[in-house]
């Protein structure tokens, strides 16, 4: 259901082990300040909205995604962001290498008219950067 809703809009999908909620909040604040009213789906409550989700009036969606169970691979992406990658959720991914491969798949879903943004300072992201198209 979420994937279908998001597919109807231009979207920014934020992934990573840490900083997803903060990054999603910052981007949504920038859009709102710029008078672009995005739909926002966040993992934490946004102080400016008093909620973790908000239906906007523009054709933009800013979404915090969840890599813990691989479901972030099911969400359509226009612009992808990965903040960092740590050895988390290995109960699902089984190893750090498999987790990193999931992030490569996520980033490589970004269409040619979109853009991917990564934190190259993060050692795990740096180690996969040559696999990102």
Task: Give the label of every model feature segment.
Residues 1-133:
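Phosphate-binding loop of NTP-binding sites
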């Amino acid at each position: 259901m979420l994937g279908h809703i998001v597919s109807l809009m231009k979207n920014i999908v934020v992934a990573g082990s840490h900083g997803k909620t903060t990054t999603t909040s910052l981007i949504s604040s920038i859009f709102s300040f710029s008078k672009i009213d995005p739909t926002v789906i966040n993992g934490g409550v946004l102080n400016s909205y008093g909620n973790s989700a908000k239906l906007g009036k523009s054709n933009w969606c800013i979404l915090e995604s969840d890599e813990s169970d691989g479901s972030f691979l099911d969400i359509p992406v226009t612009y992808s962001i990965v903040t960092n990658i740590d050895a988390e959720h290995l109960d699902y991914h089984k190893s750090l290498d498999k987790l990193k491969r999931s992030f490569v798949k996520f980033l490589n879903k970004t269409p040619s008219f979109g853009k991917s943004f990564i934190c190259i300072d993060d050692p795990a992201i740096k180690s996969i950067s040559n696999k990102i198209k």
